[in-house]
Amino acid sequence: MSNSMTFQGVVEKGIGLGKKLGFPTFNLHVEPLPELAHGVYAVRARLGDASHGTGEVWHDALMHFGPKPTVSMESVFCEVYFLKFPEGLEIHELEVEVLGKLRDVMKFVGLDALVEQMKEDERVAVENYFRK
């Protein structure tokens, strides 16, 4: 996996909104923040840091990087949603590889519109990045 940006982050507890909307995310604390434009990205992520032998399998995922204007949260957030992920694992750290940007951060009129766009983001990512 070369010529792409990778970074690591520590998983922090969020407010649970992604899970409530059907898109459970891992909220990452990343320092320093990657030099990345705010937006939604197709990524691959794995548990922990490969250099420590804690994660061997890359998982297809989406990442939101930036503020969350629909819910009036203006700080920069880094959230990772796995398309398929085994349940029940306790995750403390993720390594993320950025594959490509899907779209800019947008403000939606409500949560229903946000969910519809998230479904579309997943469809576009699968078609353009994860099709096998």
Model segments located where?
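Phosphate/ribose-recognition catalytic cores of enzymes acting on nucleotide-derived substrates
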Residues: S2-K132
